[in-house]
Amino acid sequence: MKGASEEKLASVSNLVTVFENSRTPEAAPRGQRLEDVHHRPECRPPESPGPREKTNVGEAVGSEPRTVSRRYLNSLKNKLSSEAWRKSCQPVTLSGSGTQEPEKKIVQELLETEQAYVARLHLLDQVFFQELLKTARSSKAFPEDVVRVIFSNISSIYQFHSQFFLPELQRRLDDWTANPRIGDVIQKLAPFLKMYSEYVKNFERAAELLATWTDKSPLFQEVLTRIQSSEASGSLTLQHHMLEPVQRIPRYELLLKEYIQKLPAQAPDQADAQKALDMIFSAAQHSNAAITEMERLQDLWEVYQRLGLEDDIVDPSNTLLREGPVLKISFRRNDPMERYLFLFNNMLLYCVPRVIQVGAQFQVRTRIDVAGMKVRELMDAEFPHSFLVSGKQRTLELQARSQEEMISWMQAFQAAIDQIEKRNETFKAAAQGPEGDIQEQELQSEELGLRAPQWVRDKMVTMCMRCQEPFNALTRRRHHCRACGYVVCARCSDYRAELKYDDNRPNRVCLHCYAFLTGNVLPEAKEDKRRGILEKGSSATPDQSLMCSFLQLIGDKWGKSGPRGWCVIPRDDPLVLYVYAAPQDMRAHTSIPLLGYQVTVGPQGDPRVFQLQQSGQLYTFKAETEELKGRWVKAMERAASGWSPSWPNDGDLSD
């Protein structure tokens, strides 16, 4: 069960090939099909009670049976697929008169393969099953229940085929001259084939138990070896014989389709045969559905065990959509942290890998409902392939290992969101017209306190995002408003308000959110504070600025340390350069009116350096790349000449 995730094959054909290849060269020549050995006339069951005829397998007698590897037995995830069987199975070439009707040849093949199949069912039920059951009762070396689980409902399948299906086929073929049809017989008995779904659903579990108890119990292995070495078993293992019921329904579908193709256009059996084919197909689909449901619940149970039985996820309504590792972008730490996600159709489990993996591999940190969830890509140069998952309980900034993995995760999230919205009938028409942005902003205000916000990272600001006072480690520490996610100081966040997404518990909020959530008027001291010329919020995103990026600030003008500043030419003030300490700061520490400045190349030796010069003023900058330096020089030359954009996207040079 891998993120993102391996696709499961649609047919058991590959497993049959494994079984074929595991046989000895003496047991079956290369290329010979498993059914060719089983479907010989001498393999037919007796018509009356008495000692069973032994199967003549030629040189296979006495050869040592080969077992199928446990890895293959424990990894069967294949579905029954008639299409795959049509490609892998070809009709048996029958000997007989060349003048025999082609449709009768198919019916003859159906009868012969059914006789061989009943012989194998007899071996499974009356020999393997009964011998193991008798040994379990007498020796107590292994539980009877284990034997019953391994063989599932094989007794019912054997009785149906030996007492009903095979005799009906035999009678109809004997009476073929007077009544040349087979569709009505299959049509009458096809509904009983749905009993195969229980056997197929149990097959993987049976294979696991068989492999386990073969290793665990010497007496269990002794009984198997004795029967497998007999002529009746044909030197084939129990695992090989157990696979035949899984194969049988696709074989019926293949033969019946060929029978319909051979029928004359106006044959009286045309309608009945077609209806019988539809019923056979329905039985195959019933088995497929049983396998799918079994695998889905098995996946849930495996996740349940990996979580240490901490979370109740084994629910018939839950479906695991995707799982895998991601990196969590922290709002305090610089290095992303390893996390693991389990995405279901109705919830996301955000987990932390356990250091000591005794029992459970992961600990559930947060459970987020898919209902009301939003997902979008984060355009973050520092953390590429990152995306935001915003839910009612929590908002996460996550980083994938590649662009393809990020897209795959976002598609999985969006598919789950779309599905649950459709089910809840909550689709609404998207906002149209120029009011779209205003409506979105109003929607965000209305959701304040209803869903967990996206927290601004600590390093993205150097001052309180409400009062613009600089932070320091002793007297003014950073706090996060639990309603809007802003980084604020203690004085601006000295308020408590009940937040619905946190079960109406009181949480620390900033003064603006406190006023919105409670309706209380802000203190006059806060309202009367005048806005300074530098108190212009940083245009951290490209759509808010003509140019923005980090630049190294060089020279005594900036101090000896030469700090790195977030430089912005805003769209709404295109002739001024603002320099911030961090991208999310609400106040710049320097602003430079660019009109009349001269942009020159910096000192020789570093092509990434450029300067702004006017009279006695000189500012020196260093870009991270030459390409970025070229864009900054072009943007500053435009501003210095008095140029300003005439429409919103004109002259956009930002990252």
UniProtKB/Swiss-Prot annotation:
The modification Phosphoserine is found at S11, S48, S654. Residues 319-418, 544-641 form the PH domain. It is found in: Cytoplasm, Cytoskeleton; Cytoplasm; Nucleus; Early endosome. Signal peptide: none annotated. Residues 18-64 are annotated as: Disordered. Zn(2+) 2 binds at C481, C484, C510, C513. The keyword Secreted does not apply. Keywords: Cell membrane, Cell projection, Cytoplasm, Cytoskeleton, Endosome, Guanine-nucleotide releasing factor, Membrane, Metal-binding, Nucleus, Phosphoprotein, Repeat, Zinc, Zinc-finger. Residues 102-290 form the DH domain. Its main location: cytoplasm. One of its GO terms (cellular component) is lamellipodium. Activates CDC42, a member of the Ras-like family of Rho- and Rac proteins, by exchanging bound GDP for free GTP. Activates JNK1 via CDC42 but not RAC1. Binds to phosphatidylinositol 4,5-bisphosphate, phosphatidylinositol 3,4,5-trisphosphate, phosphatidylinositol 5-monophosphate, phosphatidylinositol 4-monophosphate and phosphatidylinositol 3-monophosphate. This is FYVE, RhoGEF and PH domain-containing protein 2. It comes from Homo sapiens. The lineage of its organism: Eukaryota, Metazoa, Chordata, Craniata, Vertebrata.
